[in-house]
Amino acid sequence: GCTGDPARRAGNEYLFHMLASANTETFKEQGVRKVVTHCPHCLNSLKNDYPEFGATLEVIHHSELLQKLIEEGKIVPQQKAEENVVFHDSCYLGRHNEIYDAPREVLNASTTSSPIKEIEQSRETGTCCGAGGACFLLEENTGTRMSHHRLDELMVNEPDTIAVSCPFCVLMLEDAVKAKNLNVQVKDISEMLVKKN
């Protein structure tokens, strides 16, 4: 089930507490000690919020697992992509949990444009895509959408691909690409390891 992060970010502490308590109880009943997340929001919630509910988990992001498996030779990228790739740092993976290198190492192992090109607004100075704070649930009506602003920053090097490590970032940036009618792909870093047909 859901970690409850979207509820907490939207201000519904009651629902978050219900979900976190139920999930913590399930983890204890099942003897869960380690969790691999695909979503940085879930990583942040499980790692930083759940201990107040009694959860004692080792929580890692899939980029960290992929990096480890690549280093151990257990995953070998099927075909290095010949793409100009830029990486978007997810707020909850980067600035909230200081995981910057793992996704870059995965990308560097899977593209010929290694090392990937960095933009000025990356790592600690990266800009949110607009999904943080449960904003992905809202309809923005005035001003420039955050996702459009972030896309403009990411497009400075004219990439073929924008690589991300968060499913919410994928949604926000894909919507911005469609709205601006740009010819660029948005992919999760795990997709970069898979051979293209």
List each language-model region with its residue ranges.
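Iron-sulfur cluster-binding electron-transfer modules in prokaryotic oxidoreductases
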Residues: 1-197
